[in-house]
């Protein structure tokens, strides 16, 4: 074992490089500054991040918090050496969970843990986090970088994100007026997003394809297409919420797919009737289903299958809400409707067939 000078071991001898950490902080400062917004204009490096809620323009706010990770999508990033977009995924997974409650994301903090800190790799990850924050309109006000030799092997790392938002009191979602006959709008996903990647990786392994091989489900390599960042729906949804006042509920379609996520925002006497014929799944989902022999029901409870977010609106307001979302860049379609259900019936029922 090496020793540094006559005073014995150093922290660096144990595998923790403080200088590398300081270098990474300098590299990420411009990215952090790029996320400033009303309420947050400080520098990183303090013991805690600051946010001025009054400067954000709220009069009687309720704070909403969420935290999440990116799951084993990170293994593809590590194996493929592509680290510049997982930060966007990290932000998306948190802020999309805020906006479904009607909250505007205000600030974000990240946790980055690795066995051996590479300042350039870390800076690329944080650059992605900053890009996600800018897209969501929230400030990156702090974070933690933990170099933990012995806890993670090789170039492995993990990420966790923490987001806080606010909504005016009385404007939180879901609203209490969801009714039979209400329309369910679907918002298209950008791809697999950040759920189901243990199954994705298993299927890719069975296929024999390398990460840098041309993808059979689109233009680009397998890794590039599977690393497509999770879509951030925040700004279009906030615009629709504020302009129309007609959105009754939103559900972020993440782990558990339709059957686990949609019922979370519905009153117990109602179920979501989903028209599977209305969904146009991206080619990646057909490839996953066919290559892995994954049944349609398993696809629907594992992946978003092309629908990353749903909105519940009254039938008379559906066209107006869809128009605002489309104007803001979303692909929107009628996915289903609200129907009555008995106490022991599932909260999601299907008609038609998923085109995979």
Swiss-Prot record:
Keywords: ATP-binding, Cytoplasm, Ligase, Nucleotide-binding, Purine biosynthesis
Taxonomy, superkingdom: Bacteria
Catalyses which reaction(s): 2-formamido-N(1)-(5-O-phospho-beta-D-ribosyl)acetamidine + ATP = 5-amino-1-(5-phospho-beta-D-ribosyl)imidazole + ADP + phosphate + H(+)
Protein name listed in UniProt: Phosphoribosylformylglycinamidine cyclo-ligase
GO MF term (any one): phosphoribosylamine-glycine ligase activity
Family the entry assigns: Belongs to the AIR synthase family.
Pfam families to which the protein is assigned, alphabetical: AIRS (PF00586), AIRS_C (PF02769)
Record HAMAP family: AIRS (MF_00741)
Pathway: Purine metabolism; IMP biosynthesis via de novo pathway; 5-amino-1-(5-phospho-D-ribosyl)imidazole from N(2)-formyl-N(1)-(5-phospho-D-ribosyl)glycinamide: step 2/2
CDD domains, A to Z: PurM
This protein's GO CC annotations: cytosol
PANTHER family: TRIFUNCTIONAL PURINE BIOSYNTHETIC PROTEIN ADENOSINE-3 (PTHR10520:SF12), TRIFUNCTIONAL PURINE BIOSYNTHETIC PROTEIN ADENOSINE-3-RELATED (PTHR10520)
EC number: 6.3.3.1
Localization (cell): Cytoplasm
Gene Ontology BP terms: 'de novo' IMP biosynthetic process; adenine biosynthetic process
């Amino acid at each position: 074992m090496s020793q540094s000078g006559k005073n014995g071991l150093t922290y660096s001898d144990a595998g923790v490089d403080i200088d590398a950490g300081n270098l990474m902080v300098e590299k990420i400062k411009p990215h952090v500054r790029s996320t400033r917004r009303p309420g947050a204009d400080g520098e990183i490096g303090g013991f805690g991040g600051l946010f001025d809620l009054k400067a954000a323009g709220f009069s009687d706010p309720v704070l909403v918090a969420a935290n999440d990770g990116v799951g084993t999508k990170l293994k593809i990033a590590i194996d493929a050496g592509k680290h510049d977009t997982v930060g966007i995924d990290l932000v998306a997974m948190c802020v999309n969970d805020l906006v479904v409650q009607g909250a505007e994301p205000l600030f974000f903090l990240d946790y980055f843990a690795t066995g051996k800190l590479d300042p350039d790799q870390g800076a690329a990850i944080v650059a992605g986090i900053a890009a996600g924050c800018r897209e969501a309109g929230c400030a990156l006000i702090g974070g933690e970088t933990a170099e933990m030799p012995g806890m993670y092997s090789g170039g492995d790392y993990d990420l966790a994100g923490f987001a806080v938002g606010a909504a005016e009191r009385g404007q939180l979602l879901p609203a209490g007026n969801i009714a039979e006959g209400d329309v369910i709008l679907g918002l298209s996903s950008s791809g697999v997003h950040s759920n189901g990647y243990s199954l994705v990786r298993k299927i890719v392994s069975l296929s024999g394809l390398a990460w840098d091989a041309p993808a059979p489900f689109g233009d680009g390599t397998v890794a590039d297409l599977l690393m497509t960042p999770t879509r951030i729906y925040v700004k279009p949804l906030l615009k629709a919420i504020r302009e129309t006042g007609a959105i009754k509920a939103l559900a972020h379609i993440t782990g558990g797919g339709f059957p686990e996520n949609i019922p979370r925002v519905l009153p117990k006497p109602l179920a979501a009737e989903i028209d599977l014929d209305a969904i146009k799944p991206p080619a990646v989902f057909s490839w996953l289903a066919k290559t892995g022999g994954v049944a349609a029901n398993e696809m629907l409870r594992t992946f978003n299958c092309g629908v990353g977010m749903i909105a519940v609106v009254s039938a008379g307001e559906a066209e107006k809400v869809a128009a605002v979302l489309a104007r803001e860049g979303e692909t929107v379609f009628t996915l289903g409707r609200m129907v009555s259900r008995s106490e022991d019936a599932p909260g999601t029922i299907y008609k038609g067939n998923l085109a995979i």
